[in-house]
């Protein structure tokens, strides 16, 4: 047995499923998950000594690549002064100033510890500010594991929420309305059915949890207009897209102004950090200045703030996003060319430093139904064959891939060459 197999066997006796987040268990592709020894730049190194070109990037945070010296040094320096104080620090102020400067729609920001905390807090704030209970989310969009967001979409344009996980009471989920991503008619139908009851829409501007599905040109502006028409708030979940699709996020890339924004992943530089913020009048409703309660023992802790501050200062340097786009575009085009040579039907979506690989005969993939029609079994085979080639993709047909500026054009070309060999055997 390999070291990964031995560790996985031991882990399953001690940790549910052997992992601390389900997708890591390779349930979406089968087999034994890799246990990682270290990472540097664009590469992961497993406990058996094999190197992989990494397109998971810790599920998005590693936009600069692994073990970036500026972030590493900032963490070491901060740790020498203490790990946690439970009191305000200067770095929290500097971090808040940096975030609000980089994302102009955020007048104020509150730091938390995860993307889930950011989205659940933003929704509570929207409900408290509007005095309404219902929310709209979209089929295939994931916003963390808060109870009100673990809702399965049924057939049709509009579905009253049904819990997607045991342990979520139906009474919690009933206020969550599920609409179809990239379908404004389904959203209008929800508002017309509940015109005075919907507090907010929460949306991934690029749906990154049904692989990678960008918005149609009219979709995000249409959501803004509907929120304005019916008095609801628009929450854009930029946990994946923030500082990756563009410096000011997908909201800037697509030209839409939210009332609230949720951030995570890149904002922590690899440390556990989330944030939410937006309009000053809305944020003023948050405790201690307002009645909507939110708190966290480790929120704004000095290590995470130091890592995030260092990361965002690097990400803000000229040319970063142009490099991400160039590398991702080359990868997407190369994969399509290699698939065409092998007569493999393939769609590759990409935006900035995000991409999605779909085995499908369809011309395009624009919604949850398109994603579910893709050939998952072929993806599983593709994943494992690419792993043998030393390329680590997301171990699920429903998760986006992530590029970093640490990837070289040689890494991209080597990945395309590996895919060409794999396509020939599929």
Curated annotation (Swiss-Prot):
Subunit structure: Homodimer.
Family under the similarity heading: Belongs to the class-III pyridoxal-phosphate-dependent aminotransferase family. HemL subfamily.
Substrates-to-products reaction catalysed: (S)-4-amino-5-oxopentanoate = 5-aminolevulinate
PROSITE patterns: AA_TRANSFER_CLASS_3
Gene: hemL
Protein name according to UniProt: Glutamate-1-semialdehyde 2,1-aminomutase
GO CC entries: cytoplasm
Keyword annotations: Cytoplasm, Isomerase, Porphyrin biosynthesis, Pyridoxal phosphate
Native species: Salmonella agona (strain SL483)
GO molecular function: glutamate-1-semialdehyde 2,1-aminomutase activity; pyridoxal phosphate binding; transaminase activity
Domain of life per record: Bacteria
Residues bearing the modification N6-(pyridoxal phosphate)lysine: 265
Annotated compartments: Cytoplasm
Enzyme class: isomerase
Pathway, per record: Porphyrin-containing compound metabolism; protoporphyrin-IX biosynthesis; 5-aminolevulinate from L-glutamyl-tRNA(Glu): step 2/2
EC number(s) per entry: 5.4.3.8
SUPFAM superfamilies: PLP-dependent transferases
GO biological process: protoporphyrinogen IX biosynthetic process
Essential cofactor(s): pyridoxal 5'-phosphate
């Amino acid at each position: 047995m390999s070291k990964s197999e031995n560790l996985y066997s031991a882990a399953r006796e001690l940790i549910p499923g052997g992992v601390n987040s389900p997708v890591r268990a390779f349930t979406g592709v089968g087999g034994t998950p890799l246990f990682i020894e270290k990472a540097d730049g664009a590469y992961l190194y497993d406990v058996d000594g094999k190197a992989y070109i990494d397109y998971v990037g810790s599920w998005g945070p590693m936009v600069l690549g692994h073990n970036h010296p500026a972030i590493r040094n900032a963490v070491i320096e901060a740790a020498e002064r203490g790990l946690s104080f439970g009191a305000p620090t200067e770095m929290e102020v500097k971090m808040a100033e940096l975030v609000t400067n980089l994302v102009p729609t955020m007048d104020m920001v509150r730091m938390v510890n995860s993307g889930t905390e950011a989205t659940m807090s933003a929704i509570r704030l929207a409900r408290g500010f509007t005095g309404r209970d219902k929310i709209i989310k979209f089929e295939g969009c994931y916003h963390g594991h808060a109870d009100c967001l673990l809702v399965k979409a049924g057939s049709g344009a509009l579905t009253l929420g049904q819990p997607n996980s045991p342990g979520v009471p139906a009474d919690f989920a009933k206020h969550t309305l599920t609409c179809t991503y990239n379908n404004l008619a389904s959203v209008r139908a929800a508002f017309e059915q509940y015109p005075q009851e919907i507090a907010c829409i929460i949306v991934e501007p690029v749906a990154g949890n049904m692989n990678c599905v960008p918005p149609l040109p009219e979709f995000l502006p249409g959501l803004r207009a509907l929120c304005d028409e019916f008095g609801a708030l628009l929450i854009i979940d930029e946990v994946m897209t923030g500082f990756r699709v563009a410096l000011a996020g997908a909201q800037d890339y697509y030209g839409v102004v939210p009332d609230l924004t949720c951030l995570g992943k890149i904002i922590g530089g690899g440390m556990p950090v989330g944030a939410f913020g937006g309009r000053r009048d809305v944020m003023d409703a948050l405790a201690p200045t307002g009645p909507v309660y939110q708190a966290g023992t480790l929120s704004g802790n000095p290590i995470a703030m130091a890592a995030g501050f260092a990361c965002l200062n690097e990400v803000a340097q000229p040319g970063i996003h142009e490099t991400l786009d160039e590398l991702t575009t080359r990868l997407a085009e190369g994969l399509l060319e290699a698939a065409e040579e092998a007569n493999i039907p393939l769609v590759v979506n990409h935006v900035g430093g995000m991409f999605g690989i779909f085995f499908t005969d369809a011309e395009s993939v624009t919604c949850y139904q398109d994603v579910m029609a893709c050939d998952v079994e072929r993806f599983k085979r593709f994943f494992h064959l690419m792993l043998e080639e030393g390329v680590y993709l997301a171990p699920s047909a429903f998760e986006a891939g992530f590029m970093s500026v640490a990837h070289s054009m040689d890494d991209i070309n080597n990945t395309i060459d590996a895919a060409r060999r794999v396509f020939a055997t599929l």
